[in-house]
């Protein structure tokens, strides 16, 4: 049984077995297939037309819009099914989770979760305060056929307190309660960690999330099996580990002598730097780095700090997992960049940014569909015996891309789909039609 048929059978069990439930399942799978086939942008209207054109299923416009805004889609169970379907999700015994936030600019009012948001990455010709949705996203980092990939696992819409105070925002009749990004991140990580109860969890973040606002709430439900890997700010102060003084009365010291700021220690550690062979950004490179175990007051525990030196710059990384080697720390943090590539795959290639929906449930369901499609694509890649060939290879880029996996998946969808989701009549005709359209698009 193929991967698509196996997952399709598990997803079918999540829907009621009555006629309405099975019709909802059929439309659910058809929507996923329409997103996965790289032919059109994933607007709701485009998806309905793609379903009619490619798969021969005509759905009334009002019925399909009602389905896309349905409150009966079992997303929690769908995500848990996908989490368990990932082959070999652990990397050296750890679950590597990338955490970051992104913005999704929109045009038009009365769009759910839109607010005036500060964009720190805005270019010179872009506004610093766009009208956009803010997404806190959790992804799974894992190597697939020799390259790091980021599989979207969960997301939350972040709404500022000022936005909620300006107007009462309701979803399904209930007022939206403010939750900061740390609380949203903790809820997603805890849910995912409970699905993998025996695995150690390493959360890889940028410097904004790398503090006790995230680490302390995570340690309460998950204990010592969760650790943090982040980048250090240059002005963070480091302390030596405390030394026990025999015979001294009173409470033992929590911190040793002050070592200085990260920038000051970087100059001192430069003479102790060594060269390591690390796989970074798709190639094995020689990295000059130095490390030291110190105390950090922002986390109130011992951390391993790694200074990575370049020609004229340096970067300081820290982790609470003292068992990680220098090479592992550098490689895992460099793999964090794949979540940024995942945002591009989700917004531009899958087309989540092009949605025109405004209703809260429709906006949320559409993003769920796009993220599930992205994760399914990478799960499909992990089940392939060998990596697909890169379509537009060059001397500097030889690894396969997300679009290459999606193209191979579209061919399998044309062959068999998810099993019981295709009507029996006209199957061969639709199969050849999809293949012809794929050839024209390519």
Positions of predicted regions on the chain:
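Single, function-defining residue in the core of a domain
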Residues: 2-16, 106, 110-111, 150, ...
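Structural motif
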Residues: 18-29, 125-131, 357-367
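Short secondary-structure transition/capping motifs
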Residues: 36-39, 67-75, 123, 127, ...
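Short, amphipathic alpha-helical segments that act as regulatory/interfacial helices
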Residues: 29-36, 135, 369, 373-380
